[in-house]
């Protein structure tokens, strides 16, 4: 997605050959116009799959997921990373490891919001090692729902997440595929 790639080039900050900081428009400050374009792009790519729900993980996946949900006319469920006082019983739970934060978290969604009739699109802000996506997929499988695909805003293609998801048979649509962050430069996969 050209607009996203330009935003990454202009406002993204390469912190290392593994880490890209995009807090100017995605995961701290949010660019609503760009998020709307991202939502439209996900909707266009997955429009014929019969989606009934979108599942993401708090917090940075929420904005792109909500915009896609708005375009597709479906609800968005975000998995919580901590136990809340209002989220107690009847939960689907999974463990995920965050590459960026280097911590393992338990994520959960209420079983009241997803069931075996659902066709679910997973959306997340980044794809690195694929652990967040696999954790969300595990939650969806616990509900016996179908997964129509995984939508990623920024994929770090030099890490194994995409291949891991493809090997497991999931459709992966990434709006920006980063080939390298070497020498402080963002290079994209040419498709």
From Swiss-Prot:
Root EC class:
transferase
Protein residues bound to 5-phospho-alpha-D-ribose 1-diphosphate: 128-132
Single Gene Ontology BP term? XMP salvage
Cross-referenced Gene3D superfamilies:
3.40.50.2020
UniProt keyword Glycosyltransferase, yes or no:
yes
List localization entries.
Answer: Cytoplasm
CDD domains xrefs: PRTases_typeI (cd06223)
Catalysed reaction(s) here are:
XMP + diphosphate = xanthine + 5-phospho-alpha-D-ribose 1-diphosphate
Q: Report the EC code(s) recorded for this entry.
A: 2.4.2.22
Is Transferase included in the keywords of this UniProt record? yes
Stretch forming the signal peptide: none
Q: Name one GO cellular component term.
A: cytoplasm
Please tell me where xanthine binds in this chain. Answer: 20, 27, 156
**GO molecular-function term, one example from the UniProt record:** xanthine phosphoribosyltransferase activity
Subunit-level organization: Homodimer.
Q: What family is reported?
A: Belongs to the purine/pyrimidine phosphoribosyltransferase family. Xpt subfamily.
What job does this protein perform?
A: Converts the preformed base xanthine, a product of nucleic acid breakdown, to xanthosine 5'-monophosphate (XMP), so it can be reused for RNA or DNA synthesis.
Query: What is the name of the protein in this document?
Result: Xanthine phosphoribosyltransferase
What's the source species for this entry? Acinetobacter baylyi (strain ATCC 33305 / BD413 / ADP1)
- The protein's gene is named xpt
